[in-house]
């Protein structure tokens, strides 16, 4: 039986230069221990490979290269004995390999390789396999070395770097061999489960999780190639259904990318926000929710950029319209204000219908809305005497007992009227003397008609005109 041959070869391999007596005693001691522990070690270590390896204490320094291959498939003797439950186990393992350095260089890894590929369930057989002569042992060693050369290229890149290390952090990163077709450890599947949980919480990485889960099933022998597209997918979420090959996926990405960048270049000068959107999407920021993503990523960007450009154009148009209205008001303030004053006078004359009142309010409101709010505060700070003088000059009576149909002005109407007068004063009349005289000459006939209809004397009109001039100044 092939399993019987490797027990003496494995036990005596590391001690060809040392005394045979010490190894014989340690071999017997170890075999007695392993016979009781063998089956329990196999059944336990088949599912949990890293438990005994991390807990074996002082065996870690010399025995990593020797323990390592058996950790991947089945740890029959090493796990059961190296748990530290027996006092003599540490001495047996340490001395059988410790007084000779060959296990660290090539001896330990090569013998472990034999056990790794031939499945040495030697712990069930007991001490009966020790009765072998050294010649048989050396012949078996030669056969094992021939077998070792067949698998050296595959296994040694992953086994030799780990042999020199004291811990086992990069064991899952090893290049694929026959061991990974049926992984015994529960750590690699749990790693993939963690990725799935994260992807469920994060909607941007949902497609990447589906890709990694599918890749882990059909590419168990190629862990490195499946992890690279999954990370790449996490960085750049794409709506297309994830293909199994990363090359096709990259081609998909190049198809989608130019459209989004072109849409950003179109609106780059009008809207700086849309420039950052496709760049952020290519960099991995999940800007689009899964609802938008099934169609493609470029249309939402184009839609949003066009919306933003439309909004910015509208706002600029409003601003330009506002500036135009301001210029028109400064040029035609006299005519507009005179129209407003005419409507006020007509309302107070005798035709007290609600229509001219509404028209007057509308005219004042249209002109007053375009004014800045700073002037409003300045208007409210003026004295009441000047306002009353203006109203009297317009023909307004403080105590309208004479005319029963005359409606008193409300506070809102007064405020609007003061706004218009203050604007006129600031724009043209106070600055330019020509405009002032012209306005007085133009507005005087309206005042005279209003006052005549209100049954006022000529002296009162002259006094009102002088007071009005003082108020304008």
UniProtKB/Swiss-Prot annotation:
Pfam families: Vasculin. The keyword Transcription regulation applies. Keywords: DNA-binding, Nucleus, Phosphoprotein, Transcription, Transcription regulation. Residues 26-38 have a biased composition (Basic and acidic residues). GO terms for cellular component: nucleus. GO terms for molecular function: DNA binding; RNA binding. Residues 292-309 have a biased composition (Low complexity). It comes from the Eukaryota. Transmembrane segments: none annotated. Residues 113-125 have a biased composition (Basic residues). The modification Phosphoserine is found at residues 49, 76, 199, 289, 381. Its main location: nucleus. One of its GO terms (biological process) is DNA-templated transcription. Belongs to the vasculin family. PANTHER family: VASCULIN, VASCULIN-LIKE PROTEIN 1. Possible transcription factor. This is Vasculin-like protein 1.
């Amino acid at each position: 039986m092939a399993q019987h041959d490797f027990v003496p070869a494995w036990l005596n391999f590391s001690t060809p230069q040392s005394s045979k007596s010490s190894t014989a005693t340690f071999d017997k001691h170890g075999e007695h221990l392993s016979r009781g522990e063998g089956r329990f070690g196999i059944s336990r270590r088949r599912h949990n490979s890293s438990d005994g390896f991390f807990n074996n204490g002082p065996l870690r320094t010399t025995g990593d290269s020797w323990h390592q291959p058996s950790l991947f498939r089945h740890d029959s003797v090493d796990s059961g004995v190296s748990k530290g439950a027996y006092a003599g186990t540490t001495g047996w393992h340490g001395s059988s390999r410790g007084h000779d350095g060959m296990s660290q260089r090539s001896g330990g890894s090569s013998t472990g390789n034999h056990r790794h590929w031939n499945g040495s369930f030697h712990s069930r057989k007991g001490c009966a396999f020790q009765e072998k002569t050294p010649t048989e042992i050396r012949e078996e060693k030669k056969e094992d070395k021939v077998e070792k050369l067949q698998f050296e290229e595959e296994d040694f890149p992953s086994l030799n770097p780990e042999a020199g290390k004291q811990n086992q952090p990069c064991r899952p990163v090893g290049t694929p061999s026959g061991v990974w077709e049926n992984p015994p450890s529960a750590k690699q599947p749990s790693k993939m489960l963690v990725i799935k949980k994260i992807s469920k919480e994060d909607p941007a990485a949902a497609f990447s999780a589906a890709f990694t889960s599918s890749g882990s099933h059909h590419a168990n022998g190629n862990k490195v190639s499946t992890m690279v597209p999954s990370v790449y997918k996490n960085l750049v979420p794409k709506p297309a259904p994830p293909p199994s090959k990363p090359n096709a996926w990259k081609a998909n990405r190049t198809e989608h990318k130019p459209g989004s960048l072109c849409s950003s270049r179109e609106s780059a000068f009008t809207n700086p926000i849309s420039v950052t959107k496709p760049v952020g999407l290519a960099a991995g920021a999940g800007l689009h929710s899964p609802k938008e993503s099934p169609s493609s990523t470029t249309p939402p960007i184009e839609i949003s950029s066009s919306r933003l450009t439309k909004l910015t154009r509208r706002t600029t148009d409003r601003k330009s319209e506002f500036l135009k209205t301001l210029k028109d008001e400064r040029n035609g303030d006299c005519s507009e204000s005179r129209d407003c004053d005419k409507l006020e006078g007509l309302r107070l004359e005798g035709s007290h219908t609600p229509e001219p009142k509404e028209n007057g309010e509308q005219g004042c409101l249209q002109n007053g809305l375009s004014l800045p709010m700073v002037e409003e505060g300045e208007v409210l700070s003026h004295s009441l005497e000047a306002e009353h003088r203006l109203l009297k000059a317009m023909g307004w009576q403080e105590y309208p007992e004479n005319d029963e149909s005359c409606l008193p002005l409300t506070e809102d109407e007064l405020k609007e009227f003061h706004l218009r007068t203050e604007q006129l004063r600031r724009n043209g009349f106070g600055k330019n003397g020509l405009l002032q005289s012209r306005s007085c000459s133009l507005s005087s006939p309206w005042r005279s008609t209003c006052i005549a209809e209100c049954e006022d004397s000529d002296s009162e009109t002259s006094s009102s005109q002088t007071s009005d001039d003082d108020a304008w100044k």
